[in-house]
């Protein structure tokens, strides 16, 4: 299931190809135990499209599995940031999978500049998410949780027939950049400069800022976890996106908007109550969607202080359990078919 042979083969390319995936590395010194890998955590690579491999990780509960939760990480969210949440959801009886976008985290890169967010399309991420659900996890009930910029990827995957029982969108990004930025991106891409970083000073820096400084969380400890991992492991570093990625994301947002009415399963949107680009209109276009604001929170809900994260995590666990309870296996089938 974890494609260990592929992982080992690609690991051997690390010395010669900076685009190759990164499997496992150094734990940041002094990192609190709650941010370490959950018991039994394992890594794998998935490459269904013939493009760079996507990295994923998985951990399971100590007892019987009630449901599988597939987390689609956002831009610059390496899977390690989800260890604390994975452990909490494992304790509720869930197997937790975290899939990184191609070109992000430890996944393979399109560009030789590892800290450049580059992609010409997010369609490969849609195909990878579908393959993850159907070929790797391959069992129900399944809840998909998309973070930030992975929301349009998840919506397209579900609308195109990926078998799942619930969809959670946590602080979803469902709006493209402003028209002026998009216009400049299209002009530069047409001239062959789409690979350039949109913010010339936006490369990764060990000086930060960290997620608290960026206003993504109130928590000074959780706010430093991303920077800690990316400092310890250079392969995980990610700066600002290229012009091509900005266009690819805008295309994904427009495709998702066209698909929203075809999402057939329950959807839960969790976002701060004062989100400038709220997903409320998107939720209204999905037939079975509920939006629950997290009052006073900042966008990185999985990294928020307990005053907000506890409520967010409770909503995730409750929705996942309710969605799992709604799954009806086929006649003569089992609740959790054995994965392939």
List where the protein language model places each region:
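Short beta-strand/loop motif that positions the catalytic acidic residue
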Residues: 263, 269-271
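Active-site glycine-rich loops that stabilize anionic/oxyanionic intermediates
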Residues: 72-77
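An N-terminal hydrophobic leader/cap segment in hydrolases
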Residues: 5, 9-48, 53-61, 338-340
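Conserved alpha/beta-hydrolase
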Residues: 79, 86-111
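Alpha/beta-hydrolase-fold enzymes
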Residues: 149, 153-237
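Alpha/beta-hydrolase active-site loop
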Residues: 115-135
């Amino acid at each position: 299931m974890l494609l260990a042979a592929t992982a080992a083969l690609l690991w051997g390319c690390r010395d010669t190809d900076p685009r190759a995936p990164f499997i496992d590395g150094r734990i940041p010194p002094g990192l609190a135990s709650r941010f370490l890998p959950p018991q039994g955590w394992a890594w794998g690579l998935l490459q269904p499209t013939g493009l760079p491999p996507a990295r994923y990780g998985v951990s399971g509960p100590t007892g019987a599995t009630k449901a599988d939760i597939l987390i689609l990480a956002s831009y610059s969210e390496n899977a390690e940031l989800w260890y604390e949440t994975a452990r909490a959801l494992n304790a509720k009886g869930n197997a937790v999978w975290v899939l990184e976008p191609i070109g992000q985290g430890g996944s393979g890169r399109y560009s030789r500049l590892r800290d450049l967010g580059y992609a010409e399309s997010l369609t490969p991420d849609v195909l990878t998410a579908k393959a993850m659900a159907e070929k790797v996890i391959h069992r129900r009930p399944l809840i998909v949780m998309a973070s930030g910029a992975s929301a349009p990827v998840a919506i397209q995957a579900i609308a195109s027939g990926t078998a799942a029982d619930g969809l959670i969108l946590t602080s979803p990004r469902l709006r493209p950049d402003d028209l002026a930025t998009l216009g400049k991106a299209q002009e530069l891409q047409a001239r062959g400069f789409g690979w350039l970083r949109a913010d010339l000073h936006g490369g990764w820096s060990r000086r930060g800022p960290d997620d608290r400084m960026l206003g993504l969380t109130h928590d000074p400890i959780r706010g430093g976890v991303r920077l800690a991992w990316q400092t310890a492991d250079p392969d995980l570093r990610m700066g600002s996106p290229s012009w091509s990625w900005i266009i690819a994301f805008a295309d994904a947002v427009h495709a998702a908007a066209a698909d929203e009415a075809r999402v057939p399963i329950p959807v839960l949107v969790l976002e701060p109550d004062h989100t400038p680009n709220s997903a409320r209109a998107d939720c209204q276009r999905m037939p079975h969607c509920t939006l629950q604001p997290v009052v006073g929170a900042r966008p990185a809900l999985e990294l928020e202080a307990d005053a907000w994260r506890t409520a967010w995590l409770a909503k995730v666990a409750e929705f996942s359990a309710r969605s799992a309870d709604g799954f009806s296996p086929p006649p003569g089938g089992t609740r959790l078919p054995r994965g392939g």
